[in-house]
A protein has these predicted regions:
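N-terminal cap/lid segment of alpha/beta-hydrolase-fold proteins
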Residues: 2-19
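Active-site loop/oxyanion-hole signature of alpha/beta-hydrolase fold enzymes
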Residues: 48, 60-102
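Flexible "cap/lid" loop of the alpha/beta hydrolase fold
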Residues: 111-118, 122-153
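The conserved SAM/SAH-binding core of class I Rossmann-like methyltransferase domains
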Residues: 62-64, 106, 129
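Conserved alpha/beta-hydrolase "nucleophile elbow" surrounding the catalytic nucleophile
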Residues: 37, 101, 105-107
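Conserved HGGG/HGGXW glycine-rich cap/lid loop of the alpha/beta-hydrolase fold
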Residues: 17-74
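Histidine/lysine/aspartate-rich catalytic loop segments that bind and position anionic ligands
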Residues: 158-166
Length: 166
């Protein structure tokens, strides 16, 4: 079920769970760019310069937050697994029917986008940003630093450190 409000839109997965999303249709014969967050991401990362620039050139945009991210409702007892996140993305795309979607995934969002395509989503394109890094000492350091930064300064510090240009 979709509910549109003047400021926010929600896709209801069931009575107790919903995803926050923002969807603007293209104004020309252009695709819709669908943004898939990193685990620490949210719609506001995409809706600033990137989203405004795309919309100014006639592209549609669709950004949303995973369960557990800002403005979503979710069952805290439910395991937020990658499969669940991909299933939610597929359901949201089926409900919103974006025109010629181009999936753009940041970090693990790129993996979720690719898995959605593997599971039948018809996409006009796929863009991966900083996705699927090789495991090793550098990635271990990044993961540990991310955890420590979140403990020290919360989500805002993490966004400043990990996605300052978005």
């Amino acid at each position: 079920i979709l509910e549109d409000a003047s400021v926010m839109s929600f896709f209801y997965l069931n009575d107790d769970e919903s995803l926050f999303y923002l969807h603007t249709h293209p104004t020309e014969d252009r695709p819709t760019v669908v943004f898939i967050n990193a685990l620490i991401g949210q719609t506001e990362m995409w809706e600033g310069y990137i989203g405004k620039t795309l919309r100014a050139h006639g592209f549609g945009t669709l950004s949303y937050n995973f369960r557990g991210q800002v403005e979503t409702r979710f069952d805290p007892l439910k395991e937020l697994s990658p499969n669940l996140i991909v299933d939610d993305l597929i359901k949201l795309l089926q409900a919103t029917t974006p025109k010629r979607p181009v999936l753009v995934g940041l970090s693990i969002g790129g993996l979720f986008a690719a898995q959605a395509i593997q599971n039948g989503v018809q996409a006009a394109g796929l863009v991966l940003i900083n996705t699927l890094r090789k495991p090793g000492l550098r990635l271990d350091w990044i993961n540990e630093s991310t955890h420590r930064a979140f403990k020290a300064g919360g989500r805002d510090l993490l966004l400043d450190l990990m996605a300052p240009m978005l």
